[in-house]
Amino acid sequence: MSADCSVGANPLAQLNKRVQQDRTLQHGSHVNIHQGAEAQAFKSGPQVSESNKFQMEQFMAGKASSGGNMFMGAGMSSGPLALGGSSGLRMSPGPAKELGARLGGAPMTGSWSQEFNQQVGSPVQSSSAVSSVSMSSASSSVARAGAYRPMNMMRPVMGLQGARAVGVERHAGPAINDAAWEQQFQELEKQVEKTLNISDPVEQQQVLEELSAEAREADYAGGDYEKRFQQIWNDIHDQTDDLDSRTELGGGSGDYQRVFSTRPAQTAQYAFETDNQYLHNTDAYKIGCILMENGAKLSEAALAFEAAVQQDPGHVDAWLRLGLVQTQNEKELSGINALEQCLKADPHNLMALMTVAISYINEGYDVSAFTMLGRWLETKYPAFVEEPLDRVDRYNLSRLIIEQYLRVANALPEVDPDVQLGLGILFYANEDFDKTIDCFRAALAVRPDDECMWNRLGASLANSNRSEEAIQAYHRAIQLKPTFVRARYNLAVSSMNIGCYREAAEHLLTALSMHEVEGVAMAPGSGNVPSSNILETLKRAFIAMDRRDLLERVVPNMDLQQFRGEFNF
């Protein structure tokens, strides 16, 4: 398997994903399921608690509480990110050992699969566990700027427990007399007026007008304001169209349409490299396989597979390998497009289903990821799937699929690393990183030389603020596959987490050098353009090094030779 975890920080893309969430009831696919603590705690439906009703009543009356805070998930931060709150969330014996014990007749007492079932039946407990997120400030601006996502995501985490506590406390406390409230407000108003000396309404208006004029001048002082705003707006609009095209998938077999969406639509088109030396080579697919086996650059292997699918658009294996290569090459969207084309031709391709599920998690399309994971299990172990996924509402989808994976894991005579992978992805999406780590380690016990699994383990460790352990996992992945661009990129981010900015820059420059293919120009809009994630992270590394002179050199298609005199890569 080769879908991998990665780190990216594209603010426009993140804003677009927030816009995408508002349309979940329309498409039911390619949306982020993490819309609040309730969703993460597997609540069975859009239920409203009494405290939330009370807060809504306060809001409608103009007395909304500000107790609820929303934080951007910052796995790159040096501060603790505690998603559990109790050690009970850990799988203490480990999945492999636990599975063996269960198969030998041992009860499930103390296992996290039993804990999961208990949490599903206890909304209050689950909500509390999720809402116990704590986050300290990062040690540098770089740490705050970059952030891990569930496998590639900066997901907003709703701290709703604080809001609930405030709401309950106010509801339970003695009612405040209206007259007393008005008196306190007037006293506070007088104190502010006295302190700021703005009691004169005419003077207040003059101050506001002056501030407004200064603000307008400041807005326009930086250059062509309208042009820059229009450019940003156009980028947001274009990315929204791109997500819509991916949401409205279809046009293939009935199974394919059922997995993606009930609406007839078209799969997003893959952007091919125009300068391709293998385009007229009839053995392009074989050449691509040889390049991968011999450790060639992933970008070069991608060119061979691109040529193969252009020669034969129905070549399932070529589309599959192209998707695998691009996800490893830190080109997620190109990988998703290729994998979707593979599934359009073969909806039951197990490797494509699992790989695209991880890529969907990376891009924030959790509902589609859960659907793909359910489809994978339904295809490989149909006897364990009791309820068709098309009859399950999206709020119960994650819980149901986790239960199905646990049922399979408990019943198998030996550990299936792919089942552990799927289970780990599900926990990863719900930010249960301790369980994710145990699942990935159980898979590595069976497949110790799986470089992609080592990379996924590293991403999970990094999200648990265990950067040193993550770095070891990434090094193991790179040792197994030196051309693994995504692992190098993740290694750079973890290096930045511990303050090793120079080393991070060298890892990023190495990754960029692997995107270069001899004799191939990197044309804008082609699939061979270096990852913007790598370029942006390199800029942050140079900023952390206080090297503004180097920052100015970081542009698309830059000549990497200018950095070789100072950096080893």
From Swiss-Prot:
Q: How is it modified after translation?
A: Monoubiquitinated at Cys-5 by PEX2 during PEX5 passage through the retrotranslocation channel: monoubiquitination acts as a signal for PEX5 extraction and is required for proper export from peroxisomes and recycling. When PEX5 recycling is compromised, polyubiquitinated at Lys-17 by PEX10 during its passage through the retrotranslocation channel, leading to its degradation.
Query: In Gene Ontology terms, what is a biological process of this protein?
Result: protein import into peroxisome matrix, docking
Entry-linked InterPro entries: PEX5/PEX5L (IPR024111), TPR-like_helical_dom_sf (IPR011990), TPR_rpt (IPR019734)
Subcellular location per the Swiss-Prot or TrEMBL entry: Cytoplasm, Cytosol; Peroxisome matrix
Q: Where is this region: Amphipathic helix 4 (AH4)?
A: 229-245
- The record places the motif (WxxxF/Y motif 2) at 181-185
Q: What is its main location?
A: cytoplasm
Give the matching PROSITE patterns: TPR, TPR_REGION
Q: Which GO terms describe its cellular component?
A: cytosol; peroxisomal importomer complex; peroxisomal matrix; peroxisomal membrane
SUPFAM superfamilies in the cross-refs: TPR-like
| Superkingdom field | Eukaryota
For the region Amphipathic helix 3 (AH3), give the residue spans. 150-154
Say where the cross-link Glycyl lysine isopeptide (Lys-Gly) (interchain with G-Cter in ubiquitin) occurs. 17
Q: Where are the residues of the annotated region Amphipathic helix 1 (AH1)?
A: 6-28
Q: Where is this motif: WxxxF/Y motif 1?
A: 112-116
- Report residue spans for region: Amphipathic helix 2 (AH2): 53-71
Q: State the Gene Ontology terms under molecular function.
A: peroxisome matrix targeting signal-1 binding; protein carrier chaperone; protein-macromolecule adaptor activity
Which keywords does this chain's UniProt record carry?
A: Cytoplasm, Isopeptide bond, Peroxisome, Protein transport, Repeat, Thioester bond, TPR repeat, Translocation, Transport, Ubl conjugation
Q: Where are the TPR repeats?
A: 281-315, 316-349, 417-450, 452-484, 486-518
Q: What is known of its domains?
A: The TPR repeats mediate interaction with proteins containing a C-terminal PTS1-type tripeptide peroxisomal targeting signal (SKL-type). The WxxxF/Y motifs mediate interaction with PEX14, promoting association with the PEX13-PEX14 docking complex.
Subunit structure comment from the entry: Interacts (via WxxxF/Y and LVxEF motifs) with PEX14; promoting translocation through the PEX13-PEX14 docking complex.
Task: Say which family it is in.
Answer: Belongs to the peroxisomal targeting signal receptor family.
Q: What function does the entry list?
A: Receptor that mediates peroxisomal import of proteins containing a C-terminal PTS1-type tripeptide peroxisomal targeting signal (SKL-type). Binds to cargo proteins containing a PTS1 peroxisomal targeting signal in the cytosol, and translocates them into the peroxisome matrix by passing through the PEX13-PEX14 docking complex along with cargo proteins. PEX5 receptor is then retrotranslocated into the cytosol, leading to release of bound cargo in the peroxisome matrix, and reset for a subsequent peroxisome import cycle.
What is the protein name for this chain? Peroxisomal targeting signal receptor
Organism, scientific name: Eremothecium gossypii (strain ATCC 10895 / CBS 109.51 / FGSC 9923 / NRRL Y-1056) (Yeast)
Instruction: Give the taxonomic lineage as stored in the record.
Output: Eukaryota, Fungi, Dikarya, Ascomycota, Saccharomycotina
